Regions:
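Non-catalytic linker/capping segments at the edges of enzyme domains
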Residues: 1-28
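A generic structural signal for short beta-strands and their flanking turns/coil linkers
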Residues: 5, 15-19, 63-69, 81-83, ...
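Hot-dog-fold acyl-thioester-processing enzymes
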Residues: 20-52
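Hydrophobic residues in beta-strands and at strand termini
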Residues: 23-25, 73, 121
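Hydrophobic alpha-helical segments of small multi-pass membrane proteins
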Residues: 39, 43, 47, 68-73, ...
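Hydrophobic beta-strand-centered segment that forms part of the acyl-chain substrate-binding groove
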Residues: 51-84
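HotDog/MaoC-like acyl-thioester-processing domains
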Residues: 77-79, 84, 88-124
Length: 124
């Protein structure tokens, strides 16, 4: 499903521990309420936060897996909205990385959601 979501890399700052990825809300991602399905938003969050976690843990292990993820939805994402997943590395240990993220709509810079996740570096 991730290729169909067509994520766009916007920025990454290794020193600050941040990444920004953009997504375009598409018709197929809407739920019966005609807003973006929370599971699709969660997939975008997991993908973006996991990408950042992998960036910092890839030297210790080739794979990173999601251990926990907590998402809070604040505002709806509508069809056609462009939204950014802005991630920040919160902590980094030997095998665990914790990342926090915001879902921000381009229209009026609306905060649509927040999330935190912990990822584990594994050697498969």
């Amino acid at each position: 499903v991730i290729p169909q979501m067509d994520p766009v890399f916007v920025t990454c700052d290794f020193v600050k521990g941040t990444i920004d990825m953009a997504y375009h809300a598409q018709e197929w991602e809407l739920n019966p309420e005609n807003i973006m399905h929370g599971g699709i938003i969660s997939t975008a969050l997991d993908t973006s936060m996991g990408f950042l976690a992998h960036y910092y843990t890839h030297l210790s292990a080739p794979t990173v897996v999601t251990v926990t993820m907590n998402v809070t939805f604040l505002k709806p994402v509508l069809a056609g909205d462009i939204f950014h997943i802005k991630c920040q590395l919160d902590s980094l240990g030997r095998t665990l990385a914790t990342v926090k993220a915001e879902v921000r709509l381009e229209r009026d810079d609306i905060l649509a959601g927040i999330a935190t996740a912990t990822f584990m570096a594994v050697n498969e």
